[in-house]
């Protein structure tokens, strides 16, 4: 029996699944840290912080930056900085700075992963409704989808500000299934991180885990999705469609 024969709709995560957003996110994080005279983190480190929304991204960035600054000052024989504003207030300021800078660099710092457009197009042509579920702040989502020319594929889009509980809570996925008019078990959810797989399990949705995303440096198989794929277009044969041969480049 085909594991996905009862699927009537497909929903996707965004960052690390459909798009490589790390360059833009890392640039905005580092500009915000620099503006507060804190150490900058770099893309390789920021990648491990992506996936839980901007507020938690800021908390992780600030925690690391304050610790890094203390370590650097200690190696130079300087006392730790003891006149910081409270961390909660600093996170709030950092988030405002991040939002401003990310708005400037999001489009030029985000790229489609290979096979995204042709896979979405094939699924849409089959008549499957497609949804997007992301923890990314909602104001950034629609402009980014339009800039990448993939907004046209989605009938339902849920951003991080559209629900009270973000992934890994099931609420965003349940909302998408409801708007599609299908049961959760009829909606396949495709993601790259443990948050995605946990949300799918909690919602009762079958799940696909992709190996190429961020996932905090962990292997996706540790989250035990129903199926693991190396490439997004590996999904097509499982849904009765021919495997895409269109070789999209990351920078298309």
UniProtKB/Swiss-Prot annotation:
GO terms for cellular component: cytosol. Specifically catalyzes the dephosphorylation of 2-phosphoglycolate. Is involved in the dissimilation of the intracellular 2-phosphoglycolate formed during the DNA repair of 3'-phosphoglycolate ends, a major class of DNA lesions induced by oxidative stress. One of its GO terms (biological process) is carbohydrate metabolic process. Belongs to the HAD-like hydrolase superfamily. CbbY/CbbZ/Gph/YieH family. Its cofactor is Mg(2+); chloride. Keywords: Carbohydrate metabolism, Chloride, Hydrolase, Magnesium, Metal-binding. The active site is at 13 (nucleophile). InterPro entries: HAD-like_hydrolase_sf, HAD-like_sf, HAD-SF_hydro_IA, HAD_sf, PGP-like_dom2, PGPase_prok. PANTHER family: PHOSPHOGLYCOLATE PHOSPHATASE (PTHR43434:SF1). Gene3D superfamilies: HAD superfamily/HAD-like, Putative phosphatase, domain 2. Its EC number is 3.1.3.18. This is Phosphoglycolate phosphatase. Monomer.
């Amino acid at each position: 029996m085909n594991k996905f024969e009862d699927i009537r709709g497909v929903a996707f995560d965004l960052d690390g699944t459909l798009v490589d957003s790390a360059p833009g996110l890392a640039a905005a994080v580092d500009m915000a840290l620099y503006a507060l005279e804190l150490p900058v983190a770099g893309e390789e480190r920021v990648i491990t912080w992506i996936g839980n929304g901007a507020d938690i991204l800021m908390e992780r960035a600030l925690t690391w930056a304050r610790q890094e600054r203390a370590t650097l000052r200690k190696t130079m024989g300087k006392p730790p900085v003891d006149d910081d504003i409270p961390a909660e207030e600093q996170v709030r300021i950092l988030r405002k700075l991040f939002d401003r800078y990310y708005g400037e660099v999001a489009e030029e710092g985000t790229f489609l992963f290979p096979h995204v457009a042709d896979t979405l197009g094939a699924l849409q042509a089959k008549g499957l409704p497609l949804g997007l579920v992301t923890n990314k702040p909602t104001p950034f989502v629609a402009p980014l989808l339009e800039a990448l020319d993939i907004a046209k594929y989605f009938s339902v889009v849920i951003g991080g500000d559209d629900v009270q509980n973000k992934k890994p809570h099931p609420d965003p996925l349940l909302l998408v299934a409801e708007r599609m008019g299908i049961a959760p078990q009829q909606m396949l959810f495709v993601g790259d991180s443990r948050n995605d797989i946990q949300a799918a399990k909690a919602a009762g949705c079958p799940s696909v885990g992709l190996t190429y995303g961020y996932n905090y440096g962990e292997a996706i198989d540790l989250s035990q999705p129903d199926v693991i794929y190396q490439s997004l277009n590996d999904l097509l044969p499982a849904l009765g469609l021919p495997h895409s041969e269109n070789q999209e480049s990351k920078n298309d």
